[in-house]
């Protein structure tokens, strides 16, 4: 009997041991961990540096308008000071010969012909007189009006472009005044007859002269300058159209007391670059529409 009880006890202990081992081998039941996500936070607000911020383009307005390099239009018409003193004898001309014969002091030359080409004069390049001569240039003679005072050259047309004085040589000025005083050129057109291109001569020139007035004229190229003046005093260039000159509008060298008012400058320069509205050298008291002429270079 004791043996039987001992056997039963042994079997019970063995069953318990086996039951414990089986439990150890089984994976314990676990609860699946919940998936977590990072908390969504707003991106920090940043300030863009001023150098990176998009800016709107700004417009700069100059206190004093600066003219374009090759053209300029006066803000208002100029007012000329008269240069003619005393009486004049009026002479109407229609040919180059008549024009040359009329050159004298105290004279008003009124141009009636649509065109006077100085190269058609009978004594072109060879004739001369007390008040004019011809200077030989590279490609032809240049007319020089000399030693006269109180002289007017005026076109008789309704507009300045109705009457034209011209010259063929491209190295010659169309009309030059030398050692003259009280000269008035008005209401007329001056320019070279040949098509635009390279020229070494300009349109209207004053040398060693004083009290000259160029008013209401059309001065065109291919001349290098519309008006050139050297060693002269008291000149006025008023209310003209100066255009298509290869170097520029007006040029003054060793001059004093010059006014350039109310003019329009257009198409100055050539294929190599724009021209100057005004150029001065060794001058005193040069103004353009009341401003210092040197600022318009």
What spans do the regions from the language model cover?
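Acidic Gly/Asp/Thr-rich repetitive segments characteristic of extracellular carbohydrate-active
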Residues: 70-127
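Hydrophobic core
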Residues: 9, 13-17, 51
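Sec-dependent signal peptide cleavage junction
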Residues: 17-34
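Positively charged n-region of N-terminal signal peptides that target proteins for export
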Residues: 1-8
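Detector for repetitive beta-architecture
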Residues: 90, 96, 106-108, 113-115, ...
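Feature marks extracellular polysaccharide-active and adherence modules
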Residues: 112, 146, 154-156, 178, ...
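Extracellular beta-strand-rich solenoid/capping regions of secreted or surface-exposed proteins
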Residues: 100-105, 117-154, 164-186, 192-209
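Short glycine/acidic-rich loop motifs that flank beta-strands on beta-rich extracellular proteins
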Residues: 120-121, 164-174, 193-202, 223-230, ...
């Amino acid at each position: 009997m004791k043996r039987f009880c001992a056997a039963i006890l042994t079997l019970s202990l063995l069953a318990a041991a086996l039951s414990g081992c089986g439990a150890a081998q089984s994976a314990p039941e676990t609860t699946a961990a919940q998936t977590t996500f990072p908390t969504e936070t707003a991106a920090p607000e940043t300030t863009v540096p001023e150098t990176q911020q998009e800016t709107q383009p700004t417009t700069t307005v100059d206190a004093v308008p600066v003219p374009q390099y090759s053209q300029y239009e006066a803000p208002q018409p100029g007012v000329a000071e008269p240069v003619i003193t005393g009486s004049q004898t009026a002479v109407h001309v229609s040919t180059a010969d008549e024009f040359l014969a009329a050159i004298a002091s105290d004279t008003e030359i009124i141009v009636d012909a649509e065109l006077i080409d100085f190269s058609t004069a009978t004594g072109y390049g060879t004739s001369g007189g007390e008040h004019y001569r011809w200077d030989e240039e590279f490609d032809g003679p240049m007319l020089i009006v000399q030693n006269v005072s109180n002289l007017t050259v005026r076109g008789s047309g309704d507009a300045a472009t109705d009457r034209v004085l011209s010259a063929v040589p491209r190295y010659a000025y169309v009309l030059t005044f030398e050692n003259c005083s009280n000269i008035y050129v008005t209401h007329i057109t001056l320019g070279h007859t040949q098509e635009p291109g390279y020229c070494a001569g300009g349109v209207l020139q004053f040398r060693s002269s004083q009290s000259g007035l160029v008013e209401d004229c059309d001065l065109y190229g291919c001349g290098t300058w519309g008006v050139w003046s050297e060693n002269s005093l008291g000149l006025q260039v008023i209310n003209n159209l100066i255009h298509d000159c290869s170097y520029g509008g007006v040029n003054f060298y060793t001059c004093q007391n010059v006014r350039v008012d109310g003019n329009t400058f257009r198409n100055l320069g050539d294929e190599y670059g724009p021209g100057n509205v005004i150029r001065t050298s060794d001058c005193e008291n040069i103004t353009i529409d009341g401003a210092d002429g040197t600022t318009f270079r």
